[in-house]
Amino acid sequence: MNKLYEEYDNRIAFLIVYILEAHPTDVWQMQSNIKDKVLFATPKNEEERAFVAGACVRKLGIKLPAVIDEFGNSSEQAYTGWPDRIYLIDTNRRVLYKSKPGPFGFKPEELRTRLDRIVKTASRANLRQ
């Protein structure tokens, strides 16, 4: 995602919404979390969630802007975001692309194809004005 963000940042708005911790140490620990040193128990309040989100962004080297879902998980529920999803949403709030659950369901080339289409359409529209 960092690569796509760097490539399209001046034309597409990117945002990560940190939702429920996918693999907390007290529920379902994954080897990838151990390797990446992303080892956190389930946050018990918004402050803990903010701390974990910030640590994950730093430890994983995420360059995209990030926000945190509220503790009631409204974004996660609205977009079925757990454990990870990639969405492409237009300015009218229509979902143009929804990945399969990640990280195994992520297909960056599918997303790149959609992004290219949007950029081309926007460029043609700007030329007509």
Segments (PLM) and residue ranges:
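Structural microenvironment flanking redox-active thiols in thiol-disulfide oxidoreductases
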Residues: M1-L60
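Gly/Pro-rich cap/lid or specificity-loop segments adjacent to the active site
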Residues: P43-K44, L64, F71-G72
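Conserved beta-strand termini and adjacent loop/short-helix elements that scaffold enzyme active sites
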Residues: V17, V67-D69
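Loop/turn elements at helix/coil->beta-strand transitions in domains of secreted/extracellular proteins
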Residues: D9-A13, G61-P65, P83-D84, T91
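Thiol-/selenol-based redox modules, centered on thioredoxin-like
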Residues: E70-Q129
